[in-house]
Amino acid sequence: MDESLEHQTQTHDQESEIVTEGSAVVHSEPSQEGNVPPKVDSEAEVLDEKVSKQIIKEGHGSKPSKYSTCFLHYRAWTKNSQHKFEDTWHEQQPIELVLGKEKKELAGLAIGVASMKSGERALVHVGWELAYGKEGNFSFPNVPPMADLLYEVEVIGFDETKEGKARSDMTVEERIGAADRRKMDGNSLFKEEKLEEAMQQYEMAIAYMGDDFMFQLYGKYQDMALAVKNPCHLNIAACLIKLKRYDEAIGHCNIVLTEEEKNPKALFRRGKAKAELGQMDSARDDFRKAQKYAPDDKAIRRELRALAEQEKALYQKQKEMYKGIFKGKDEGGAKSKSLFWLIVLWQWFVSLFSRIFRRHRVKAD
């Protein structure tokens, strides 16, 4: 193991996860759950006789050159039936595409990617001749014969040939080192409030440590990889919370908690996202677990107080609502007051029972 890399990882340990207790507001991204191709109004750019592109979101910087290693997410559909047969966003694992060395069935996609900048999202139209051909593909992915395709593609970023080599040709030390550099670049961009660009760097860092790579690691190699990979997921979650994309933030926290179930930052950020979605009881459970593992954390105490205040405000609102209902029917009547307090008591009992049941279920799991 490269001793300098190990020292670098330890040196940056305190800086590896960004602090995000603020509430910057930036524009939201489109949903990552599309089952049909997006409707795009932009003019189609012809890239090849069989390939055209419509830009959904502009990128930044330069375009990749031949033999660049590109990291991207995409969804793919057959054009006629609009059957979605592949979705890398669903797996939360970007793919690697080396331009000029792509598989034959990805030739059309590669032409589209070569025309895109980092951060650009586009709808790429590919004729069957530059896709799965006359015979199609009957294993995975399942594509019928002579099928024209649609790709919704987002280029996360790319490495020029002069900067490095394909992940498969890298040693363990090189891959972890490359990922750590991307993570630190992401942290710098986050501090500048460039959230989308920061997430691209974190995604590229994660791309160096896919499931196939992590599966081969053990001992200190695994620990060093997780010390880079998990903070990237948490930092993406922090960006997504600022972008108000709460469901996606929860997904990245869940990935970390699969590896480290006692990670207080993952529990805290998941709780924060759940609270924003109105899942108060579940958010409280996450905050309390986080507090158990980080008892001195002021941010956790602050979120628990905020939840308690929200519940108190909701209780007062319900109280006033029921008062208004019964006041109209029986001004000052003893029966109305009794019924009101009976309803309030019943709601409290149901809420208490629900919490007890949830705690028992969590313990059982």
Curated annotation (Swiss-Prot):
Gene3D superfamilies: 3.10.50.40, Tetratricopeptide repeat domain. It is a single-pass type IV membrane protein. Residues 1-163 are annotated as: Interaction with MDR1/PGP1. Residues 1-44 are annotated as: Disordered. Belongs to the FKBP-type PPIase family. TPR repeats lie at residues 179-212, 230-263, 264-297. Residues 163-337 are annotated as: Interaction with MRP1. It comes from the Eukaryota. This is Peptidyl-prolyl cis-trans isomerase FKBP42. Interacts with calmodulin (CaM), MRP1, MRP2, MDR1/PGP1, MDR11/PGP19 and SHD/HSP90. Interacts with 1-naphthylphthalamic acid (NPA). Residues 1-15 have a biased composition (Basic and acidic residues). Disruption phenotype: Plants display helical rotation of several organs. Reduced number of small and curly flowers with low petal formation, as well as poor flower fertility due to short stamen filaments not sufficiently elongated to position the anthers above the stigma during anthesis; this phenotype is associated with reduced length of epidermal cells in the middle of stamen. Loss of auxin signaling in nectaries leading to reduced starch accumulation. Impaired ABCB1 and ABCB19 localization at the plasma membrane of endothecium and middle layer cells of stamen. Residues 310-326 are annotated as: Calmodulin-binding. PROSITE patterns: FKBP_PPIASE, TPR, TPR_REGION. PANTHER family: ARYL HYDROCARBON RECEPTOR INTERACTING PROTEIN RELATED, TPR_REGION DOMAIN-CONTAINING PROTEIN. InterPro entries: AIP/AIPL1/TTC9 (IPR039663), PPIase_dom_sf (IPR046357), PPIase_FKBP_dom (IPR001179), TPR-like_helical_dom_sf (IPR011990), TPR_rpt (IPR019734). The gene is FKBP42. It comes from Arabidopsis thaliana. One of its GO terms (cellular component) is plasma membrane. GO terms for biological process: auxin-activated signaling pathway; leaf development. Signal peptide: none annotated. Residues 67-159 form the PPIase FKBP-type domain.
